[in-house]
Every structure is written in C-alpha cells, then in structure tokens.
C-alpha cells in the first residue's frame, strides 16, 4: 500500500509502527457552528480510508478530537446570549447527527479539548523548561519558533520567508511575530482553568498535541486533516510535539482537498456557503456521500448541481444493479476475485476512489447482464458489490427505501392512497382501486400485491 505523505511530498510505502495496527489522529471540528460541506468532504475522505484499512485487516485506532474551547466558540456564545457549554453541546449533537446520516463511522476515541487541560499544561511546562516557550509581559505563554530548527518542514517554507510574508497580528509581548500562543490569560467572563501562569485557557495548537500524545503516544502512524490546516496548525503541532517529546510526531501526514462551489472558493462572504443540513434537504445522504467520495481524497472537489445530479445518477445505477437480486456469498463465481483484486489495486495506490468506483460499475454491469440468464452467478456478484460498496461506505440505505425518497415523492401520501385502495378492494369498489393504481403508476410508483399486503417502489 502506498499513499502520498505530505511530510515528504511524495508517495511512500506504508509501514506501520506495529504490525497490523494503525494509530491515526484526525483533527476534528471546532464546534461553534453547524458543520458545512467542507467538513463532510474531510471526514468522509478519512472515513473511507479508515474503512479501507479495516477491510485490509488492520486494527485501527482512530482518534478524532472535538475543539470545545476556542475564541470563535466564546464569541458565538456571547452573540447568542448563551453559555459556551450550551453552544458546544448543541453543536456536538448536531455534528453527530449529520455524520451518522452520512454513514461516517464513529472514531475509536473522541476526546474534547477541555478534558485534556492537565496534559496541555504539562506539555507547556516542559516546553518552557527546554527553552521552547516563554511567558510574555501580559502573562500569555508563547512558543519560540526560532528555537525549533525544523519549523516549516511540513509546509515546505523556511522561517525567514514566513516572517517576511507574515500577516500574523503583531503582539508586543512576542519575541517574534511568528511565535504562537500556548496559553492565554483569562479575560473577565470567559471560561478559565488554573495553571502555573495564572487562570486561563489553552491555545488551539497545543490542544491537538496533548490529545494525540495522551491517546496515541509520542509517535504514531498517521496524522490527518484538511489541507487548510497544514499551515499553521499542523506545522505548529509538529514544533510543539517534537520539541517536547524529542522524537518524530507522526510518520505520515494525509491532507484532504478543499471544496469549491461552482469553481469558486466556498465562503460566507461569497454567499456560496452550505451547511450539511442544507445540502441534505435537497439531496439524499447516499448522493452526498457518493459525490464527496468520488474524487481522490487530496484533490479539490467542485460542488455544483451538475456534479450532484451526476452522483445521483451513479448511485441509482448501483442500486438498480442490486434490485430484485439477493446477494449470496456462497454463489461467488471463481472469477470474482479479479474484480476484488482490481479494487484493491486502485485503493492501494493512494486510495484512488475513482478507479475503485469504476470496478464497482463493471460489477454492476455484469450483474445486470446475468440477472436474466444466470441468477445464481448474479447473486454471487451482488454479494461482492455489496461488500466493496461497504468499504467505501456507500449504498447503506435499504434499496426500496432509497427509491421511495426524493423527486417530490411524498411517502405518507402514497401510503394513504394504498390504504384507500385496500379498503376499496374490500368494498368491491374495483374501479376506484384501479384508479388509484393508475394514478400512482403515472407518478412512477409501482404497486406489488401479495398475501401480506401491498408494497410500493419507484419504477
């Protein structure tokens, strides 16, 4: 298995620290607002990778943190006239809800920053003792970037160039404009914790260093996050952790590509910013997940109605292949392994989901061909298609339930009409029963009568 390591800037053979085990950390959400489509892109990308590692037999420990204390959280809570706790708890629940709808697996561990304050304080104390950090005149503690010789190795920038192009706010108590805060002194009315430097709260960057150290150790296999976090967040994590622990922080770095909207950067100022909930009001979670998983994880992805409609058509092609056929493992044909080998070859090469999906469509075509000529063989291929779709986390909805949703179909109204038709048949009003069947047929709804009742599906 090879994949692109942002640290080296090239594809590398993956070698875990411990055989058959993977320790992976993914930077989580700062829960000051609803999750947006960019979050969905990032966490679906890493969910696919997590699922693929498990499919390949690895025991994966995935840590995905929650940043539950931050300037943005305090600002938003004040604007809303609520406590930071109320804001955070509501947004964490909303995040969990939309992630579940998108079929994103729960991480092995999901630490909150506020649960790891003692570990952050301990790391900062170590950095001060080693000369990598200092306390400013106003009490804030800063990281001394000039002390860390490798600063810039992840973002491929040297410190001198960073200083010249810096847009960092100049703070008088900093020794260097690039120095970043490790501990902020408390302001009136803000959440605060005790520390050797006085009551305050941690800086953003130290949070991830402390949480990963606590749960995965000083060195772990993979650190993942959105490409927008590469600098300064991930660069600062490396500086903190490697100075404190005197060893490599993470061996491999994975960065997911950003979402563009109609080829423009997504931002609230451009009025092209979409929350996940807003997108799911228009498109089924299957479609959204497929769309976001269909591009190589580290490439930019263009959010547009056209691309989502294409994703919808693709999802329906795969679902239609599995319609009216029962997946049966024991019916797997001898040549089925060829499809699985092609799938593995694609995913082993930097998690190439477009090539992996091409294999799934080849399987779907085979199933459609065999449905009328060899149902036994078709059912074996259907099992394999289901299995490989699960690796990508797609086709997680019941087939008929999927086809009952969307396109203006009101399931409750259809159920009412079916109930009325059933009663009409009991009353021997067959003209009305036929009228309802024809009415639904014109809407693309097919009724299937059986001894146990009437079911329906979209044609």
Curated annotation (Swiss-Prot):
Zn(2+) binds at residues 27, 208, 233, 237. SMART domains: DALR_2 (SM00840). Its EC number is 6.1.1.16. Keywords: Aminoacyl-tRNA synthetase, ATP-binding, Cytoplasm, Ligase, Metal-binding, Nucleotide-binding, Protein biosynthesis, Zinc. A motif ('KMSKS' region) lies at residues 265-269. GO terms for cellular component: cytosol. A motif ('HIGH' region) lies at residues 29-39. It is found in: Cytoplasm. It comes from the Bacteria. Its cofactor is Zn(2+). One of its GO terms (biological process) is cysteinyl-tRNA aminoacylation. ATP binds at residue 268. GO terms for molecular function: ATP binding; cysteine-tRNA ligase activity; zinc ion binding. Binds 1 zinc ion per subunit. It catalyses: tRNA(Cys) + L-cysteine + ATP = L-cysteinyl-tRNA(Cys) + AMP + diphosphate. Belongs to the class-I aminoacyl-tRNA synthetase family. Monomer. PANTHER family: CYSTEINE--TRNA LIGASE, CYTOPLASMIC (PTHR10890:SF3), CYSTEINYL-TRNA SYNTHETASE (PTHR10890). This is Cysteine--tRNA ligase. It comes from Francisella tularensis subsp. novicida (strain U112).
């Amino acid at each position: 298995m090879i994949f692109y390591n942002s640290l080296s800037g090239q594809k590398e053979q993956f070698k875990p620290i411990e055989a058959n085990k993977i320790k992976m950390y993914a930077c989580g959400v700062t829960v000051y607002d609803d999750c947006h489509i960019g979050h969905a892109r990032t966490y679906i990308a890493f969910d696919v990778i997590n699922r693929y590692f498990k499919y390949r037999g690895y025991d994966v420990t995935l840590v995905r943190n929650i940043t539950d204390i931050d300037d943005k959280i305090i600002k938003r809570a004040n604007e809303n006239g609520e406590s930071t706790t109320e804001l955070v708890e509501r947004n964490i629940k909303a995040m969990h809800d939309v992630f579940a709808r998108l079929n994103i697996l729960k991480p092995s561990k999901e630490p909150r920053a506020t649960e790891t304050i003692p570990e952050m304080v301990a790391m900062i104390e170590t950095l001060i003792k080693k000369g990598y950090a200092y306390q400013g005149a106003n009490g804030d503690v800063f990281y001394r970037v000039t002390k860390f010789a490798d600063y810039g190795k992840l973002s491929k920038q040297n410190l001198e160039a960073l200083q010249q192009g810096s847009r960092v706010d100049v703070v008088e108590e900093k020794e260097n404009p690039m120095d970043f805060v490790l501990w902020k002194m408390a302001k009136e009315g803000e959440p605060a914790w005790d520390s050797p430097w006085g009551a305050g709260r941690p800086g953003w960057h130290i949070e991830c260093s402390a949480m990963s150290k606590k749960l995965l150790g000083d060195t772990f296999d993979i650190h993942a996050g959105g490409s927008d976090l590469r600098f300064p967040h991930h660069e600062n994590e490396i500086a903190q952790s490697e100075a404190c622990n005197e060893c490599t922080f993470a061996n491999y770095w994975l960065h997911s590509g950003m979402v563009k909207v109609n080829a423009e950067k997504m931002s609230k100022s451009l009025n092209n910013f979409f929350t996940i909930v807003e997108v799911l009001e228009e498109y089924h979670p299957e479609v959204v997940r497929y769309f976001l998983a269909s591009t190589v994880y580290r490439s930019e992805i263009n959010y547009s109605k056209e691309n989502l409609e294409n994703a919808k058509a693709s999802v329906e092609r795969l679902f239609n292949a599995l319609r009216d056929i029962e997946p049966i493992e024991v019916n797997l044909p001898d040549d089925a392994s060829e499809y699985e080998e092609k799938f593995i070859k694609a995913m082993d090469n930097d998690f190439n989901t477009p090539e992996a999906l091409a294999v799934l469509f080849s399987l779907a075509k085979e199933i459609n061909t065999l449905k009328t000529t060899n149902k036994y063989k078709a059912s074996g291929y259907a099992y394999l298609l289901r299995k490989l779709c699960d690796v990508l986390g797609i086709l997680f909805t019941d087939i008929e339930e999927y086809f009952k949703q969307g396109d203006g179909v009101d399931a409750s109204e259809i159920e009412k009409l079916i109930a009325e038709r059933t009663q009409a048949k009991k009353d021997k009003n067959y003209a009305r029963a036929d009228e309802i069947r024809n009415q639904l047929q014109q809407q693309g709804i097919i009724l299937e009568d059986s001894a146990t009742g009437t079911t329906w599906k979209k044609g």
